[in-house]
Amino acid sequence: LSRTINFDAFEPLVIAAKNAGVERFIYASSSSVYGGSEKTDVTESHPLVPLTLYNKYKGLCEPLLFKHETEDFVCTVIRPATLCGYAPRQRLDLTVNILTNWAINRRKITVFGGSQLRPNLHIQDMCDLYKQLLIEDGRKIRGQTFNVGYQNMSVMDIALLVKRVVQEETPGEADIRIEKCSSDDLRSYHINSDKIRKTIGFEPKY
C-alpha cells in the first residue's frame, strides 16, 4: 500500500498535471529522506539514506518529477522538516504536537531516546512557502531541490521547551514530569536551509 500510494501513483499524477496545462509542480518530499546523519549540517547534496519505505519512495519520486520538466512545466522539490502547529484536524503523531498533547493532558512527557535531532517547521510557514513558490520567478526554482528545516533541536530539548511553555500557560496545574525511555527510532539530522534562504529569501516567521 505504501508503494502504491507514495510511488506508483506519483508519475501518472505528474503526467496528468502536465497534460492538463499545469505550469508549476511543487513536490513536497521530506527531510527524512536523509535518514540518520552525523554531519553538522545536512545540505541538499547529502546522500539519501531513508530508514522507512515511506521516505524511500519520497526520495525515489524526486527524479521522476524532474524527468518531465520542460520550459512550460516548472518542477521544484522541497524537503520540509517535521511540521508542527494547530490544525482543525490535529495530527498527534508529530514530535512537537504529541509532546504538547502529553504535557497538557497527562502532565507527563515521555521522551523516547532524546538525543535525536529533529528539525521542525510551523505549518503556517509551510503554507507561506507554498504560496511564495507559486509566484516566484521560475528561473530561480526550476529543477531545484530545497531543504526547509529550521529549529534543529534534540527531542529532549523540545520536551523541555514544551514543558516550560505549557507550565507558564497553565499556572496552578500540577508540575509536568519528563520520563525518558529507550527508542529504536534512529532518525537524527541537522538540516541546513541556507539554499532556499539565499535563492528566494524565505525565512520562517512562526
Where are these regions (language model features)?
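The catalytic Tyr-centered alpha-helix of NAD(P)H-dependent dehydrogenases
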Residues: 39, 50-57, 80, 88, ...
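Conserved catalytic Lys-bearing alpha helix of Rossmann-like short-chain dehydrogenase/reductases
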Residues: 7-13, 22, 55-65
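Conserved Rossmann-fold NAD(P)-dependent oxidoreductase catalytic core, especially the SDR/UDP-sugar
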Residues: 11-53
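Active-site Tyr-X1-5-Lys
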Residues: 36, 49-79, 104-105
